[in-house]
Amino acid sequence: TISNVTTQSMISGSISVFSAAVTVTIMTYFGVPVSSSQAIVGSIMAIGLIEGGVNWAIILKLILAWVGTPIGGMIFGFISYKILSIPFNKIKSIYIKERSIQIATLIIGAYGAYSLGANNVANITGVFAGTIGVSTAALVGGLAISFGVLTYSYKVMMTVGKQIIELDYFSALIAVLGESITVWIYALLGIPVSTSQAIVGAVIGAGYARGSRLANKKVLLKILSAWVNTRFQLV
């Protein structure tokens, strides 16, 4: 889908990726979870507008998906919590509860990583798929994501995990599940979406299902503002 937004050469694709990378890096420095998919599409659109060719049908499909991503995360986070908390709360043994969370963390964490790889690797590497091949592009993208997680993700983790809404271990796990389901559905549809937006929506959904309230409305407004700016500042 990304590679079909407009015709890309290796040079224009590199410029698009660099522009998106700079934008996301700046936002990450300030601890704001933003969308790499929206950043790359914005930069690709800028190239397309300059060269006179943008596939507006695909752009419309992407915009609709972007609006639906945080909403979907919120819905799946809320529903998953309401359903799974019933059998979980019936467990009396603290040891069994802790073991259940540990096992579920491994399973849901693996599912979340799989969904991330299935969807988000294409955000950046999609522009190169026609030039260097899909397999090579996917490999490079996967390695780059791993490097980013290890070196530069702490501030965004703290924003999502502690500054939006209060979560316990169980609701945090459910939030990851809600995000993973949302991103995986879009991966099946071949639409690149934002895991950042999906997890923010899922965190809010799981938090409200638990009975929590927003910890800091200013942080949420800051995130929403950054989402809008990411979409348009490169166009």
Regions found by a protein language model. Give the residues of each.
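Multi-pass alpha-helical transmembrane bundle typical of ion/small-solute transporters
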Residues: 1-235
